[in-house]
């Protein structure tokens, strides 16, 4: 299954643990969406990132091929947060070559507005740099840093 991952899901340590058989396919953007921190994480003690519709914006991430076993593991980790916190949704992403691909991703059921903390953003940055996302993506995530 083709899965679009973004944010903390891109961290290689986390990805190996949650989807050990994943295969990187390509970088992509989710058009007409942005990142919001609309769920609280007791593990991170801060807001968790989720994609949400937003005209004119885009979210950088990567497309991975994940196995059924990977998907079961990923869903188990998503269930570590309260039930129905995240759901799988089908979205169309754009590859760097401009090709539109239908994929699955996780989106949160929002409950409020929260702020990320530096340690969470550092974890995200490790993933962005590992997969060589463009500077635009890195700058966007830097802009979420607490002031």
Tell where the protein language model's regions lie, with residue ranges:
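Glycine-aromatic micro-motifs
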Residues: 1-147
């Amino acid at each position: 299954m083709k899965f679009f991952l973004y944010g903390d899901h891109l961290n290689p340590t986390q990805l190996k643990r949650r989807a050990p058989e994943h295969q990187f396919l390509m970088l992509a953007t989710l058009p007409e969406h942005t990142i919001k921190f609309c769920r609280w994480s007791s593990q991170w003690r801060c807001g968790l990132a989720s994609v949400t519709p937003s005209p004119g914006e885009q979210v950088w991430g990567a497309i991975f091929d994940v196995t059924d076993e990977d998907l079961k593991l990923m869903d188990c980790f998503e269930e570590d947060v309260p039930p129905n916190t995240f759901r799988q949704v089908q979205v169309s992403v754009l590859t760097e070559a401009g090709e539109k691909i239908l994929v699955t991703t996780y989106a949160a059921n929002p409950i409020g507005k929260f702020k990320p903390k530096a340690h969470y953003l550092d974890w995200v940055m490790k993933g962005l740099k590992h997969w060589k996302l463009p500077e635009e993506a890195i700058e966007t995530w830097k802009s979420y840093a607490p002031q």
